[in-house]
């Protein structure tokens, strides 16, 4: 047990997960596209697709665990997913799923960052070091996923 706690502390304090500043996207233009919502087994999912129809962001409610997964396509693993909103930003530990090609982070449904995403003025951004950030409009589908996980 002590080894597991020590490993977790070392990981959280490692340079790979250092709390470097998340870039400011206040003046960034949101990608043209639209959010859609779909009920899925065990929750709901909001997907942002660009104007070419390519999925760019996913917010998924896992109702059984009351968690929200934030994911974006990625060519490779990265230790951190950067989340930016008009009033908050945070680096989140990320996990890569090679089967789906998605890099994701998980938040509890009550995490205040989700409220910041839902209420962000105009846009949100999800970034990964070495890849362009995805700047998407902050539409109601974000709130729908968050609220569904809180019920």
What does each model-found stretch correspond to?
Residues 1-4:
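Positively charged n-region of N-terminal signal peptides that target proteins for export
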Residues 13-15:
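N-terminal signal peptide c-region/cleavage motif recognized by signal peptidases
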Residues 19-79:
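N-terminal secretory signal peptides
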Residues 22, 87-151:
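Internal interaction segment
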Residues 46, 80-82, 123-126:
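Short polybasic amphipathic segments
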Residues 50-52, 83-85, 128-130:
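Short acidic, glycine-rich loop/turn motifs
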Residues 78-90:
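Extended low-complexity, serine/threonine- and proline-enriched intrinsically disordered segments
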């Amino acid at each position: 047990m002590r080894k597991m706690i020590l490993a977790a502390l070392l990981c959280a304090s490692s340079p790979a997960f250092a709390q470097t500043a998340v870039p400011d996207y206040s003046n960034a233009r949101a990608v043209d596209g639209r959010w859609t919502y779909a009920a899925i087994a065990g929750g709901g999912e909001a997907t942002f697709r660009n104007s070419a129809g390519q999925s760019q962001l996913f917010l998924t409610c896992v109702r059984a665990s009351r968690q929200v997964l934030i994911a974006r396509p990625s060519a490779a693993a990265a230790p951190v997913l950067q989340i930016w909103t008009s009033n908050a930003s945070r680096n989140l530990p990320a996990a890569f799923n090679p089967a789906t090609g998605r890099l994701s982070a998980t938040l509890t449904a009550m995490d205040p960052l989700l409220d910041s995403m839902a209420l962000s003025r105009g846009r949100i951004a999800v970034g990964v070091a070495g890849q362009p950030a995805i700047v998407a409009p902050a539409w109601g589908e974000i709130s729908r996923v968050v609220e569904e996980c809180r019920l």
